[in-house]
């Protein structure tokens, strides 16, 4: 298969994975009903958000975390796919053509082709497949496929400032980890970095390995979960009071995204202390723009907290405040108005003024 055929065939098996601390890729193996990714993608957390072409954003549980191999398994319900990925069983050779699939920079489903420049490159104590396909941030955890569409490795890391020099964990390590995990027949398994034993989360006391006594950092992160603090905690508290699912709304630690009707609201907390909540309503029409502008100006004079603005050709309804002024009461009032007004104004602008619905790549 060529690159486009591989992408068309298997893109439904490629999963986007997000935590407040990182984002990356993974791939679904139907045989195990597991999503395979990197340990560093899940950032030690037990709960992550997953999505795909066939899967709406939802929380899922990391059931296996292996810092040694930089592997993690995520449990999900069976995905009904016409064609499913499977691990290769064939030896990889220098010069083999490969395709790396993932979500670079959080974008949807891209594939880059290249070759195996070295089938076994020793890094630390593990052998990796060195490839020259472009691997970008966000590709981590995604599959590297051969020409038959079989998984030969997991995109794991790149060498900074190199010319497309990427490294994939070979399928043999993945298969070894899957076999060991399946043999235990239980979830919530962590590999100790010191003794390399697989231990159950419930057997770990005070975050120390029950086999060798060395502290397991991943155990503490999984137990505590993600804990927002300061202004981020205040913002998320407001959103929760409004009935929003904060875990699904997060886009990193300092940004949240919520869709209300056809409007999309993005809340950003900047390093300078400014909080901006933008509702992207619709696009400017090609006709009757003056009439629309007049309406926006009239509405601006009537509103507290909120203001209309134009960003390129998008009509925005915005709320801006500095963190030192944000309190739960005033924040809840302002964001409540933004959410309700956004749902009303996008309909008015589209129906009465010919504004154009924004097409979104979800």
Q: Could you describe each region identified by the protein language model?
A:
Residues 1-25, 47, 179-184:
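N-terminal activation segment of mature serine protease catalytic domains
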Residues 220-288:
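Long, charge-rich boundary regions
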